[in-house]
């Protein structure tokens, strides 16, 4: 069974319209660069972009492909296991046909998703593997899964904001608490009074760059965005809810967030819509002198541990 994502869905729709099976290969047990590249999607990479080129760039070497045995398709040469098959036209089954639980699999928000009524079927034609293959996969919603999913989120936001206001957005972290998609922490640098308010424009651009994003937390350049304690510290000491919260109701977001349903709020017209929110935890530029972090002298460790390296 398969539940294809774009752009693969485009190919399956074309094949089904022609009444033809779509040959596909599934490579299991590949190197980390390939798994990371597989997470990329629009707008970071447009439809039709070859994500394997990202994997090649990350590993400094092209990804080797090999011809499948039973179908006219290629597979990743050094995969532990390769499943060869065809996506059958006009064939559908319930996603939970084996369990009958009404549930499918653990999803990135941390909940088990509802089983789809009808998903496409793959007819397996061959399985090839290395000697003593290792079945290695990523199961969500763990840290590994959501951190990989966050990479294209971060890339999309950095790219769009940098083009609009060069040098202002220093870094982005698609926080694992949001599954790498729903929550982003933006580190913004205000260099002059004219930059006040631009941090909020950066947050709006982030929503445009990655439509699945739900919440943005804005912090200053002296806050470590990869340290949740530091981010929460900024929220406690540099944020006032009545003036630093910006809400944008009725915006398309992600249907796997169970709170994004009409039953949760009358402002949600249909599943997958949300109230997007900006939490501005940056210091107003004219008050920066009141928000200097405590500094401590550097400690020469070798005074106490002469052999310390």
Regions found by a protein language model. Give the residues of each.
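Charged, compositionally biased interaction regions
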Residues: 30-309
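Internal mixed beta-strand/loop scaffold within catalytic domains of large alpha/beta enzymes
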Residues: 1-27
